[in-house]
Amino acid sequence: LWWLPEPRWFALPLALLGAFWLLLPRGTPGKALAVLLWLPLLWPDRRLPAPGEAELVVIDVGQGLSVLVRTANHSLLFDAGPAVRDGFDAGERAVVPALHALGVRRLDAAVASHGDQDHAGGLAAVLRAFPAPLRFAPPDVEGAALRGLRLRTCEAGREWRWDGVRLRFLHPPAHFPYLRNESSCVLRIDTEHGSALLTGDIGEVVERDLVRRAALSPADSLRADVVLIAHHGSAESSDPAFVRATGARYALASSGHGNRFGHPRADVLERWRRPARRSPTPPRMGPCGSGSARRRTGARAGRARFWNRDAKHTRGCGTRPGARLGYPIARIEVGHGPEVRECWNW
């Protein structure tokens, strides 16, 4: 079965126009040209990063995490969202369809930041559809979702390059015991124009240790344009020293809409606002309406229900390339020129 990326919004109307044209009475001029109107539907535009650039796509898996990292010729999935026994599997229901819609044909690597279900639960379903040859997880990882998988360790210092983009693990260091959240893989992505930091569920203790190690080694620098706020924006993450060390222009919090934990915490978001004197980009993950590259109102805000008073406070930002996708994803382009672009999508 061959999956095509989701086409642009105008592809289906053009295809219908072509079908109508072919059904016109015999002798209608130019009927053979009607087939050309099907091309946008059958061969959609695959927008891929150029060499030296990377694209981050945050997939809305509810209260969990799943991030696609894509370079010109390679793809990596960082976590695969939650799954529960005999219940919802975000890997099957959200991640795999989103990868198909994005035109991903293979995964070159998959990372389970740690063994908790909200991060690794959907990995088995993803690997059935996209059997990634490289699979990373913390040393001695525990978790039902990872049993039986052949895994490499995401030990600090392990790095490689894809298409001019450097990917490097910053945590956990060698001989670090498995402590669930505190053992989360931390991945740094460096492009020609910008950088990103994916932090898993680490807490303030590990964040302070990363600041200390960054001061000793330039290779472990925390400076980044885009930072994934650790642990969904919980109160146990985002140490002020860590926030300052990143100097992030954009901060992303992956959390379920209306979750019972109150993620992301308002005080945590304020820590990220303060250094840059600007709002972090992801008040909450969730659907957003289509629009231009400027700030806009999300779909939840535009279609707020009377039982959800907080919906009007959900905002999003976007770039036109992501606005065409019919899946709940947030797109960040790292290093697409000097600016980091973003999209909170439906």
Residue ranges: model-predicted function:
Residues L1-V57, R70, Y250, E270-T281, ...:
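Transmembrane helix-bundle segments that form internal channels/tunnels in multi-pass membrane proteins
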Residues L14, A120-G121, A125-R212, R273-P283, ...:
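Flexible, acidic/histidine-containing loops and adjacent segments that form or flank the divalent-metal
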Residues A50-F169:
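Soluble catalytic regions of membrane-associated enzymes that act on cell-envelope
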Residues I59, Q63, G91-H100, S113, ...:
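Active-site-proximal loop/helix segments of hydrolase catalytic cores
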Residues G81-A83, D140-V141, A156, A174, ...:
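Short, acidic/turn-prone active-site loops that include or flank metal/cofactor-
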Residues E339-N345:
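Short, intrinsically disordered C-terminal tails of secreted or membrane-associated proteins
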